[in-house]
């Protein structure tokens, strides 16, 4: 077996590397070339990069494409650029805006991975005769411990917990996992940068890319307003107990759990606890109203060994992350008449619809990724849940 788990010599194995122009994917290309693989580098031009050309931490923009080209020249592999701007807008940017005006907190990186990178680019890699598509993500894959067929693989958390990207990859399908390779899964980021220096790559000291590459300076509301001019409609700021406290200029300016910049002063600390898109109301309340014990999921991608329905009916004990920066915490995957849900044993504050809930076998660096889903509804403590239900059933002011 070679280092990518193929039963052939590296020189007989063609690999396409998804190159963003950053240090991680550049090192992947360099490592594979050094090991003797037949390597092709492909960079996707994903969005109108005019505003991002000179912005540190951008991704798949003008300078990034040039950096990827220079890296490929340095290590001696072919480099191709594919224009996916229209596809990226259709499958990532537009749904991102739609989700925000619906009162959700979307994660466009998941959509990008599943549509543009792991679907379209993967198909292109196969057309080029590649045996695998390699990326610079910090996650591990290896042969499945209980394979149902030859070549089945499973996902695991990486060695560098601070760089763990498994949360953004929960929706990777089994077919995609079998074809993908993640050479950096066993390396710390510091070693990746050291390798870039050793290889003489121009990106060795380049800043890491931002989570949301197409949002300049992190101002989500700017891009949503541009794409959806009617999104910034005014409405009420309402307390969980029914009091109208003020007005806002669009729910897209708020997120669940927000405390600063709400726009009301009451003498008590208030947090955004719910965004009522239908009635254009921002619902605020005390911190304890953010406490969440249960989240209902949609679009579940299941990577466990037993059937999803059987696992949920029996109450599948696992660990869950509802934020990329948190460690997995004890959870139970179950189901009821409403659908699949995850019971968060220790609770979590400020969980918003649209966020992901990724599932794991444990909390360590070698924990297996069981998949996950998008949160469609969160359930609070009984008192807060009852108050919110009563408020939503009451008509909003005209």
UniProtKB/Swiss-Prot annotation:
InterPro entries named in the record: MnmA-like (IPR004506), MnmA-like_C (IPR046885), MnmA-like_central (IPR046884), MnmA-like_central_sf (IPR023382), Rossmann-like_a/b/a_fold (IPR014729)
Q: Name one GO cellular component term.
A: cytoplasm
The UniProt annotation puts the region (Interaction with tRNA) at 163-165
Reaction equation(s) it catalyzes:
S-sulfanyl-L-cysteinyl-[protein] + uridine(34) in tRNA + AH2 + ATP = 2-thiouridine(34) in tRNA + L-cysteinyl-[protein] + A + AMP + diphosphate + H(+)
Residues the record marks as site: Interaction with tRNA: 137, 355
This chain's function reads: Catalyzes the 2-thiolation of uridine at the wobble position (U34) of tRNA, leading to the formation of s(2)U34.
| Name of this protein | tRNA-specific 2-thiouridylase MnmA
Residues annotated as the enzyme's active site: 112 (nucleophile), 213 (cysteine persulfide intermediate)
Does the entry annotate any disulfide bonds, and if so which pairs? 112-213
Alphabetically list the UniProt keywords. Answer: ATP-binding, Cytoplasm, Disulfide bond, Nucleotide-binding, RNA-binding, Transferase, tRNA processing, tRNA-binding
Q: Which organism is it from?
A: Sinorhizobium medicae (strain WSM419)
A Pfam family hit = tRNA_Me_trans_C
Database matches in SUPFAM superfamilies? Adenine nucleotide alpha hydrolases-like
Q: List GO BP terms, alphabetically.
A: tRNA wobble position uridine thiolation
């Amino acid at each position: 077996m070679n280092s990518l788990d193929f039963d052939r010599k590296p020189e007989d194995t063609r690999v396409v590397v998804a190159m963003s122009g950053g240090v991680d994917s550049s090192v992947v290309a360099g490592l594979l070339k050094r090991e003797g693989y037949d390597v092709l580098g492909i960079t996707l031009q994903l969005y109108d990069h005019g505003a991002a050309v000179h912005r540190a931490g951008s991704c798949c923009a003008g300078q990034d494409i040039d950096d990827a080209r220079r890296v490929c020249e340095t290590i001696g592999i072919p480099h191709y650029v594919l224009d996916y701007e229209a596809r990226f807008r259709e499958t990532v940017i537009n749904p991102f805006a739609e989700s925000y005006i619906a009162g959700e907190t979307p994660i466009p990186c998941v959509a990008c991975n599943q549509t543009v990178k792991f679907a379209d680019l993967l198909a292109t890699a196969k057309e080029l005769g590649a045996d695998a598509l390699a990326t610079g993500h910090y996650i591990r894959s290896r042969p499945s411990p209980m394979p149902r067929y030859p070549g089945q693989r499973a996902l695991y958390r990486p060695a560098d917990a601070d760089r763990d990207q498994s949360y953004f990859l929960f929706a990777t399908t089994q077919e995609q996992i079998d074809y993908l390779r993640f050479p950096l899964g066993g390396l710390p980021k510091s070693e990746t940068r050291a390798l870039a220096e050793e290889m003489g790559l121009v990106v060795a000291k380049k800043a890491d890319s931002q989570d949301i590459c197409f949002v300049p300076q992190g101002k989500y509301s700017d891009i949503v307003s541009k794409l959806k001019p009617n999104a910034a409609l005014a409405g009420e700021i309402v307390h969980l107990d029914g009091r109208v406290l003020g007005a806002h200029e669009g729910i897209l300016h708020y997120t669940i759990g927000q405390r600063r910049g709400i726009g009301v002063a009451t003498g008590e600390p208030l947090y955004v606890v719910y965004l009522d898109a239908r009635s254009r109301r921002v619902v605020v309340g005390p911190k304890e109203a953010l406490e969440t014990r249960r989240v209902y999921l949609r679009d579940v991608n299941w990577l466990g060994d037993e059937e999803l329905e059987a696992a949920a009916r029996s109450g599948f004990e696992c660990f869950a992350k509802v934020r990329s920066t948190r460690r997995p915490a004890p959870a139970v995957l179950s189901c009821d008449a409403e659908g699949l849900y995850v019971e968060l044993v220790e609770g979590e504050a400020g969980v918003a619809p649209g966020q992901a809930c990724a599932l794991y076998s444990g909390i360590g660096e070698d924990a297996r990724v069981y998949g996950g889903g998008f949160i469609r509804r969160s359930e609070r403590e009984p008192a807060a849940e009852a108050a919110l239900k009563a408020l939503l059933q009451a008509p909003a002011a005209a």
